Amino acid sequence: RMRLLLLIILSLSLTSFAKMTSHSENSDMKSSSASYYSSVIGLSGFKLKTALSAQLRRTHQDRGYGSLLTVYFKSDADTSYDNDGSIMDMYSENPSSYDPYTFSNRKQACGSYKREADCFNREHLFPQSAFRKSRPMRNDFFHVYPSDGYVNGKRSNHAFGEVNNPKWTSQNGSKLGINSFGKFRGTVFEPIDEFKGDIARALLYFGTRYEDRIGSFKHAMLDGSRDKVYAGWFMKLL
Protein backbone atom coordinates (compact mmCIF):
# COMPACT_ATOMS: atom_id res chain seq x y z
CA ARG A 1 0.00 0.00 0.00
CA MET A 2 1.18 3.51 -0.79
CA ARG A 3 -0.60 5.20 2.10
CA LEU A 4 1.79 7.21 4.25
CA LEU A 5 0.56 6.19 7.67
CA LEU A 6 3.03 8.44 9.39
CA LEU A 7 1.84 7.90 12.93
CA ILE A 8 3.64 4.59 13.35
CA ILE A 9 6.41 6.72 14.83
CA LEU A 10 4.22 7.70 17.79
CA SER A 11 5.59 4.63 19.52
CA LEU A 12 9.16 5.65 18.72
CA SER A 13 11.43 8.48 19.75
CA LEU A 14 12.62 10.67 16.92
CA THR A 15 16.08 9.25 17.53
CA SER A 16 14.73 5.86 16.52
CA PHE A 17 13.13 7.42 13.48
CA ALA A 18 16.41 9.04 12.51
CA LYS A 19 18.14 5.67 12.75
CA MET A 20 15.50 4.17 10.48
CA THR A 21 15.88 6.85 7.83
CA SER A 22 19.68 7.09 8.04
CA HIS A 23 20.03 3.81 6.18
CA SER A 24 17.81 4.89 3.31
CA GLU A 25 19.34 4.67 -0.13
CA ASN A 26 17.55 7.85 -1.16
CA SER A 27 19.44 10.89 0.13
CA ASP A 28 16.67 13.26 -0.93
CA MET A 29 14.18 11.33 1.16
CA LYS A 30 16.53 11.45 4.15
CA SER A 31 16.90 15.19 3.82
CA SER A 32 13.19 15.90 3.48
CA SER A 33 12.33 13.54 6.34
CA ALA A 34 14.86 15.18 8.64
CA SER A 35 13.49 18.60 7.77
CA TYR A 36 9.87 17.58 8.23
CA TYR A 37 10.45 16.09 11.67
CA SER A 38 12.98 18.64 12.94
CA SER A 39 10.38 20.33 15.16
CA VAL A 40 9.70 17.14 17.14
CA ILE A 41 13.27 16.04 17.86
CA GLY A 42 13.67 14.84 21.43
CA LEU A 43 9.95 14.71 22.20
CA SER A 44 8.01 11.66 23.34
CA GLY A 45 4.56 10.68 24.59
CA PHE A 46 1.77 13.24 24.42
CA LYS A 47 4.23 16.08 23.70
CA LEU A 48 5.37 14.23 20.59
CA LYS A 49 1.76 13.60 19.60
CA THR A 50 0.85 17.28 19.98
CA ALA A 51 3.89 18.42 18.00
CA LEU A 52 3.10 15.96 15.22
CA SER A 53 -0.49 17.19 15.19
CA ALA A 54 0.68 20.76 14.68
CA GLN A 55 3.02 19.71 11.89
CA LEU A 56 0.29 17.72 10.17
CA ARG A 57 -2.07 20.71 10.33
CA ARG A 58 0.54 22.97 8.76
CA THR A 59 1.24 20.62 5.86
CA HIS A 60 -2.22 19.11 5.25
CA GLN A 61 -3.66 19.59 1.75
CA ASP A 62 -7.36 18.97 1.22
CA ARG A 63 -7.76 17.58 -2.31
CA GLY A 64 -11.53 17.32 -2.11
CA TYR A 65 -13.95 14.45 -1.69
CA GLY A 66 -14.37 13.58 -5.36
CA SER A 67 -10.65 13.11 -5.96
CA LEU A 68 -10.55 10.11 -3.63
CA LEU A 69 -12.41 7.88 -6.08
CA THR A 70 -9.76 8.50 -8.72
CA VAL A 71 -6.65 8.35 -6.56
CA TYR A 72 -7.65 4.96 -5.10
CA PHE A 73 -6.62 3.23 -8.33
CA LYS A 74 -3.04 4.29 -7.62
CA SER A 75 -2.88 4.46 -3.84
CA ASP A 76 -4.84 1.26 -3.23
CA ALA A 77 -4.10 -0.80 -6.31
CA ASP A 78 -3.81 -4.48 -5.42
CA THR A 79 -0.12 -5.26 -5.84
CA SER A 80 0.14 -7.55 -2.82
CA TYR A 81 -2.44 -10.29 -3.25
CA ASP A 82 -3.98 -10.73 -6.71
CA ASN A 83 -1.64 -8.17 -8.28
CA ASP A 84 -4.28 -7.32 -10.86
CA GLY A 85 -4.49 -3.56 -10.47
CA SER A 86 -7.97 -3.66 -8.99
CA ILE A 87 -8.77 -1.68 -5.85
CA MET A 88 -7.55 -3.40 -2.70
CA ASP A 89 -10.72 -3.36 -0.59
CA MET A 90 -10.20 -4.54 2.99
CA TYR A 91 -13.86 -5.58 3.22
CA SER A 92 -13.81 -7.87 0.17
CA GLU A 93 -10.16 -8.93 -0.25
CA ASN A 94 -9.48 -12.63 0.25
CA PRO A 95 -5.78 -12.81 1.16
CA SER A 96 -5.47 -16.57 0.69
CA SER A 97 -7.44 -17.11 -2.52
CA TYR A 98 -9.29 -15.36 -5.32
CA ASP A 99 -11.46 -12.40 -4.38
CA PRO A 100 -15.22 -12.94 -4.55
CA TYR A 101 -15.40 -9.77 -6.67
CA THR A 102 -13.18 -6.81 -7.60
CA PHE A 103 -13.45 -3.16 -8.59
CA SER A 104 -11.20 -2.17 -11.46
CA ASN A 105 -12.94 0.81 -13.04
CA ARG A 106 -13.86 4.31 -11.85
CA LYS A 107 -17.32 3.71 -13.34
CA GLN A 108 -17.94 1.10 -10.63
CA ALA A 109 -18.18 3.83 -7.98
CA CYS A 110 -21.54 4.02 -6.15
CA GLY A 111 -24.52 5.04 -6.92
CA SER A 112 -26.97 2.87 -5.27
CA TYR A 113 -26.43 -0.70 -4.14
CA LYS A 114 -28.53 -3.67 -3.08
CA ARG A 115 -25.89 -6.30 -2.43
CA GLU A 116 -22.15 -6.88 -2.27
CA ALA A 117 -20.20 -6.27 -5.48
CA ASP A 118 -22.65 -3.64 -6.80
CA CYS A 119 -20.20 -0.75 -6.43
CA PHE A 120 -17.42 0.76 -4.32
CA ASN A 121 -17.40 3.95 -2.30
CA ARG A 122 -15.48 5.80 0.42
CA GLU A 123 -15.29 4.23 3.87
CA HIS A 124 -14.51 6.59 6.74
CA LEU A 125 -12.67 4.36 9.19
CA PHE A 126 -13.40 7.05 11.76
CA PRO A 127 -17.15 7.54 11.13
CA GLN A 128 -17.99 10.89 9.58
CA SER A 129 -21.21 11.16 11.60
CA ALA A 130 -19.00 11.82 14.65
CA PHE A 131 -17.72 15.04 13.08
CA ARG A 132 -20.89 15.90 11.11
CA LYS A 133 -19.22 15.33 7.75
CA SER A 134 -17.03 18.39 8.28
CA ARG A 135 -13.90 19.14 6.26
CA PRO A 136 -11.05 18.39 6.24
CA MET A 137 -11.84 15.18 8.14
CA ARG A 138 -14.40 14.03 5.57
CA ASN A 139 -11.91 14.26 2.71
CA ASP A 140 -8.83 12.98 4.53
CA PHE A 141 -7.25 10.27 2.43
CA PHE A 142 -5.39 8.75 5.35
CA HIS A 143 -8.53 7.42 7.03
CA VAL A 144 -10.97 7.30 4.08
CA TYR A 145 -10.43 3.97 2.33
CA PRO A 146 -12.14 2.40 -0.68
CA SER A 147 -14.66 -0.29 0.17
CA ASP A 148 -17.62 -2.18 -1.18
CA GLY A 149 -20.64 0.10 -0.82
CA TYR A 150 -22.93 -2.53 0.65
CA VAL A 151 -20.42 -3.66 3.29
CA ASN A 152 -19.66 -0.03 4.08
CA GLY A 153 -23.37 0.47 4.68
CA LYS A 154 -23.46 -2.53 6.99
CA ARG A 155 -20.53 -1.21 8.99
CA SER A 156 -22.37 2.15 9.15
CA ASN A 157 -20.94 4.25 11.99
CA HIS A 158 -20.33 1.34 14.35
CA ALA A 159 -17.10 1.04 16.29
CA PHE A 160 -14.61 -1.65 15.39
CA GLY A 161 -14.53 -4.57 17.78
CA GLU A 162 -14.58 -8.36 18.06
CA VAL A 163 -17.63 -10.46 17.23
CA ASN A 164 -18.19 -14.03 18.41
CA ASN A 165 -21.76 -14.44 17.16
CA PRO A 166 -22.20 -12.37 14.01
CA LYS A 167 -25.57 -11.07 12.86
CA TRP A 168 -24.11 -10.69 9.39
CA THR A 169 -20.90 -11.77 7.65
CA SER A 170 -19.45 -10.41 4.41
CA GLN A 171 -18.11 -12.62 1.64
CA ASN A 172 -14.54 -12.15 2.88
CA GLY A 173 -15.41 -12.85 6.51
CA SER A 174 -15.86 -9.37 7.99
CA LYS A 175 -18.49 -9.53 10.74
CA LEU A 176 -21.21 -7.37 12.27
CA GLY A 177 -22.57 -8.11 15.74
CA ILE A 178 -22.41 -7.43 19.46
CA ASN A 179 -18.95 -6.67 20.77
CA SER A 180 -17.35 -9.51 22.74
CA PHE A 181 -14.18 -7.59 23.69
CA GLY A 182 -13.90 -5.55 26.87
CA LYS A 183 -16.81 -3.86 28.62
CA PHE A 184 -18.50 -2.27 25.60
CA ARG A 185 -21.53 -4.28 24.50
CA GLY A 186 -22.82 -2.31 21.55
CA THR A 187 -22.90 -3.38 17.91
CA VAL A 188 -19.45 -3.41 16.29
CA PHE A 189 -17.82 -4.31 13.01
CA GLU A 190 -14.89 -6.73 12.89
CA PRO A 191 -12.71 -6.79 9.74
CA ILE A 192 -10.63 -9.84 8.95
CA ASP A 193 -7.32 -10.19 10.83
CA GLU A 194 -5.22 -9.34 7.77
CA PHE A 195 -6.26 -5.69 7.85
CA LYS A 196 -6.71 -4.91 11.53
CA GLY A 197 -3.25 -3.36 11.70
CA ASP A 198 -3.99 -1.05 8.75
CA ILE A 199 -7.15 0.16 10.46
CA ALA A 200 -5.41 0.64 13.81
CA ARG A 201 -2.69 2.78 12.21
CA ALA A 202 -5.26 4.89 10.34
CA LEU A 203 -7.12 5.54 13.59
CA LEU A 204 -3.84 6.39 15.32
CA TYR A 205 -3.24 8.93 12.56
CA PHE A 206 -6.74 10.37 12.94
CA GLY A 207 -6.42 10.77 16.70
CA THR A 208 -3.16 12.65 16.24
CA ARG A 209 -4.01 14.76 13.20
CA TYR A 210 -7.24 16.06 14.74
CA GLU A 211 -6.09 16.40 18.33
CA ASP A 212 -7.30 20.02 18.34
CA ARG A 213 -10.87 18.98 17.43
CA ILE A 214 -11.45 15.43 18.55
CA GLY A 215 -12.40 16.32 22.12
CA SER A 216 -15.75 17.55 20.79
CA PHE A 217 -16.50 14.45 18.69
CA LYS A 218 -18.97 11.89 20.03
CA HIS A 219 -18.44 8.18 19.42
CA ALA A 220 -18.20 4.91 21.36
CA MET A 221 -14.52 4.57 20.42
CA LEU A 222 -13.61 7.86 22.14
CA ASP A 223 -12.96 8.84 25.74
CA GLY A 224 -13.63 12.58 25.24
CA SER A 225 -10.02 13.69 25.72
CA ARG A 226 -7.54 15.31 23.34
CA ASP A 227 -4.50 13.40 24.54
CA LYS A 228 -5.42 9.75 25.03
CA VAL A 229 -8.34 10.11 22.56
CA TYR A 230 -9.64 6.55 22.56
CA ALA A 231 -11.65 4.80 25.28
CA GLY A 232 -9.85 2.26 27.44
CA TRP A 233 -11.54 -0.79 25.94
CA PHE A 234 -10.79 0.43 22.43
CA MET A 235 -7.14 1.20 23.20
CA LYS A 236 -6.72 -2.39 24.38
CA LEU A 237 -8.39 -3.63 21.21
CA LEU A 238 -6.01 -1.64 19.02
Regions from the PLM with identified roles:
Residues 13-17:
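Hydrophobic membrane-targeting alpha-helices
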Residues 4-12:
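Sec-dependent N-terminal signal peptides
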Residues 18-98:
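N-terminal module-boundary/linker segments of secreted carbohydrate-active enzymes
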Residues 67-76, 104, 129-133, 186-190:
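Short alpha-helical segments and helix-capping/turn motifs at coil-helix boundaries
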Residues 87, 94-119:
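Short, His- and charge-rich active-site/binding loops that engage polyanionic ligands
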Residues 109-121, 125-238:
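Domain-level detector of nuclease and nuclease-like folds
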Residues 30, 103-104, 126, 181:
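A generic structural signal for ordered alpha-helices
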